[in-house]
Structures are given as C-alpha cells and as structure tokens.
Amino acid sequence: MVAEVCSMPTASTVKKPFDLRSKMGKWCHHRFPCCRGSGKSNMGTSGDHDDSFMKMLRSKMGKCCRHCFPCCRGSGTSNVGTSGDHENSFMKMLRSKMGKWCCHCFPCCRGSGKSNVGAWGDYDHSAFMEPRYHIRREDLDKLHRAAWWGKVPRKDLIVMLRDTDMNKRDKEKRTALHLASANGNSEVVQLLLDRRCQLNVLDNKKRTALIKAIQCQEDECVLMLLEHGADRNIPDEYGNTALHYAIYNEDKLMAKALLLYGADIESKNKCGLTPLLLGVHEQKQQVVKFLIKKKANLNVLDRYGRTALILAVCCGSASIVNLLLEQNVDVSSQDLSGQTAREYAVSSHHHVICELLSDYKEKQMLKISSENSNPEQDLKLTSEEESQRLKVSENSQPEKMSQEPEINKDCDREVEEEIKKHGSNPVGLPENLTNGASAGNGDDGLIPQRRSRKPENQQFPDTENEEYHSDEQNDTRKQLSEEQNTGISQDEILTNKQKQIEVAEQKMNSELSLSHKKEEDLLRENSVLQEEIAMLRLELDETKHQNQLRENKILEEIESVKEKTDKLLRAMQLNEEALTKTNI
C-alpha cells in the first residue's frame, strides 16, 4: 500500500485527487472542507481511522506537517520546517497534487509556513442558498395552505382567521405571514396585517417574514411590512439582516427602502461582514457604489481583520479596488495574519491591482509633499510676523512720547534761570560809575548808554529763545511724523483685521451653503425614493391587473372546454342508447 501511494501517479489518477478525496473526505474533512463541500468536522462518524492507507498517511504526515493535520497528532502547533521530510518522494507527490488542489488545507505545501485559512473561500454561503421554502402539502393546515397558494376567496380566508389562530406555526415554525410573504401573496399579507398579526415571529432559521420577502424578492410584501412597522434589524441564525439579503440580491430599490425605514447599515453577520463587505466579497459593484454614497464605513473589519480593500484585492475585483481608492481608504492596514492589500495582490499575481495601488501611493506622496511646501502657510506666517511687529511699535511709541515732554521741561527750567541771572545785573557794571554819571550829567547822559547797551545786554536770551523755538519745532515735526506712522500702522492693522473678518464670513457662508445643499440633496433623495415606491406600486398594480385578465381568459377557456366535453359526453350517451335500442 505504501509503494502505491509513493509511486508517481498515472494520467487517469491526475484528473482525480488520487483517491485521497474518497478516503480523506470520509476520514477527516474537518481539515478537508473542499473534499466534501463542508467545513464541519466528521470525526468519529465511521471506522476509517483503521484503514491501512490512513495509518500510513498519519505516520508520514503527522510527523512532517502537524500544521495541516492537527487532528492526526492531537496538536494544532505548526511543525513546518523542523525536518527535511518535505523533500521526501511522498511529500513531492502530495505537493504536486494537493498543493494546487487544496491550499486551504495545505498552506505549507506552497512554500509558506503561514496559515492561509480564511483568505479566500472561507465564508459560509449556505445562508444565501435556497431562498424559498420547500413545502409539502401534508405538513400544512388549511390556513397555511391558503397563505401559501393564495387561491382561496377573501370570504373563506376571513372565516378561517376567525376560527383559527393566525399566529399559529407549522413544523418549521412558520406562520401564515411567513408563507404568504415568501410566495408573494400580497392580498393575504394585507389581510393578516389588517388583523394585526405578529410581525417579527422567527421561523426555524430565525428569519422574519420581512427577511423572507426580501430573500424571495417580493417587493410589494416588503413595502407592506415596512409600512406596518416590521423590524428591519433582526438577524437570522447566520447573523444576516434584511439589508444583507437585499445587497446579496443586488436589489438597490429594496436596500433604499430599508435604509429609509431605519435599517442599520453597519450591522455585521457571524462572518463579521457588514452589507458593504458582503457586496465587496460577492463583487456586486453597483450595490457597493450605492452603499458608498450612503456613507457606509469603508474601514470596518471582518472577523479576520480585513478591510473592504483587502477583500476586493483577494477577490480580484479591480473595478471595486478603484472605487475604494477614490474614497481615500487606508492602503497600509493589515489583517490578523499581518498582510496588507498590496501583499495579497502580489501573492495572487493581480498585476492591474498592483498598478492601481502603486499609482495611489505615488499620488498620496505628491499630495503630502505639496502640503508641506504650501505657499498659503508662508503667507500666514509673514502676516502674523508683521502684526507682531506693529504691536511692538505701538507699545514703544507711547514710551517715547512720555520721555520727550520731560526733556522739554528740563530745557525750559535752565532757560528761565539764565534769564533771571541776566535780568538782575544785565552788564555787570560798577555801581559808582552809574551813580557818578547820574550826578554830573543827569539822566540825559545815561540814557543813550543804556539804550546802546540794551541790545548787547539782551543778545544772549534772544539767541537762546530762538534755539528753544527751533527745538520745539523739530520736536513737533517728529511727533507729527510719528503720529502719521502710527496712523498708517493702525490703518494696516485695521485692513488686516477686515480681511480676516471677510475670510471668516466667506467660510461661514460656504459652510452654510454646503449644509443647505446637503439638506436639499436629502430632500431630493427622499422625493426620488417616494416616487420610485409609487412607480413600483403602479407597476405592481398593472401586473396584477394583467394577471387577473389572463386568469379570467383561462377560466373562460376552461368553461368553454367543459361545455364542449359535456356536449360530447351527452352525444356519446345518446349514441350508446340508440345502439342498445337497435340491438334489442
């Protein structure tokens, strides 16, 4: 048996996974979810552990790679790289077959010791499979049958609702509202809602009637349930809300209606996916655009720590990557395994996405460099420096003005003292000369001398007065020039302040205009939504009318066929009677 496994595979065995799926799938598809299409553990369900092939595989792989086979040795610790058994012929064969076939279970076979579990096809899609109920007639009572098929007259339905409990559940915990909503019987739904049935009852998968209506894309029933107050945010057993199913179905209209009625745009399912992350993972570009417009969080993380950008890269959707990069998302964020979006793009050989990411990084670097060398900031700094200088000059000018009057006062005192000295004895002549002249010659002889001496005696005080007046004029000129300078500086300060006020007013006006625009946009969106809902109702009414006309035509044809058959039967009977009479 060992020799068979270690030998090189033939052409027929290459097409299949060399009987490992048939053996390992039963034995342990806890580690081989792709072998049987299920990630559930099947340990202990059969006696295949004693198979000779599995004993050999356990003996080889258990030592060689416990990272991939933790159940073989009872340990989940990685043993990759501890021995050289990877170059064994058995491992070469296993790498050649399983490396490409199942890197979910064999991440180390691709030359990496890191776990790749949860990187690609890790999400459970069973929630979105089989949206409609599988109904067996014998499992339903009269009310549930009428709710599912909807071919019962209104009077009979009213009688049924009087006689039985309208919130009664079947074996699968479904109410009449569940069945009517899932099959699109809007008349039955309306009748149940008018009778005030319970809206948020959960079936065996914890789904409400609203979730079933959205899952089965029954728009009219969805609108009826929302108008009557059905809860939009109740999750099912997978954690999905009604909005998750609307996004999965790419039903933008129902997603709009749910958000209009207050659905949570950031609700996560058990995989950690918000509606946006689900749309990215399923590569629903139009719905992703819609959620971005509705301001969904672009940096939210799933259970593996991955952003919307990393998911888009992993799925290989270049268009969604471009969409997200236009919104300036974080490119450098890492998931729980420490990998960025660029590393995933490089490892999966998505060259277009690599180019998009590199171009985005270059643009961001250019933006940062332009912001660092911004001329507006330099202008702001120079204006601030000028204002500080003007303030300093204003503070220094009053000090100068206060010092100048003190100097002028000192000068005035000195001049007054000198005038007093010269006024008491103007020339300093001896008293005897003046007296003698007055005795001999009288007053006439002395008067000419005094007249001639007065200009000489008073020459000094006149020159001093002139100097004083010139100093005063210079001081006044200085004061005037300084006052003019201060006036100019004050004017400049006022103009700067006015400019600042104008800029602030412009900012306020722009912010107000933006808020008004946002309000107008919201009002327009609401009006558009209401118009779309009205159009939907009109379309549904038209389709109903057309269906009724078709049904009437079919009924008329059936009646005509019945009449013809009745006539034929009567003719047959008459012929038989005639034959019997002739025979008699």
From Swiss-Prot:
Its topology with respect to the membrane?
Peripheral membrane protein
Q: Where are the ANK repeats?
A: 172-201, 205-234, 238-267, 271-300, 304-333, 337-366
Q: Region labeled Disordered — which residues?
A: 369-502
Read off the InterPro entries from this record.
Ankyrin_repeat_domain, Ankyrin_rpt, Ankyrin_rpt-contain_sf, CC144C-like_CC_dom
> Signal peptide: which range, if any?
none
Where would you find this protein in the cell? Cell membrane
Q: In which tissues is it expressed?
A: Expressed in prostate, ovary, testis, placenta and prostate cancer cell lines. Localizes to basal and terminal prostate epithelial cells.
Q: Name one GO cellular component term.
A: plasma membrane
Q: Which Pfam families match?
A: Ank_2, CCDC144C
Its keywords, alphabetically, are:
ANK repeat, Cell membrane, Coiled coil, Membrane, Repeat
Organism, by scientific name, is Homo sapiens
Basic and acidic residues composition bias: which ranges? 377-392, 401-412, 466-481
Q: In this entry, which stretches build a coiled coil?
A: 494-583
The family assignment reads: Belongs to the POTE family.
Task: List all Polar residues biased stretches.
Answer: 482-498
Q: Does the keyword Cell membrane apply?
A: yes
Q: Does the keyword Repeat apply?
A: yes
Protein name, as recorded: POTE ankyrin domain family member D
Q: What is its main location?
A: membrane
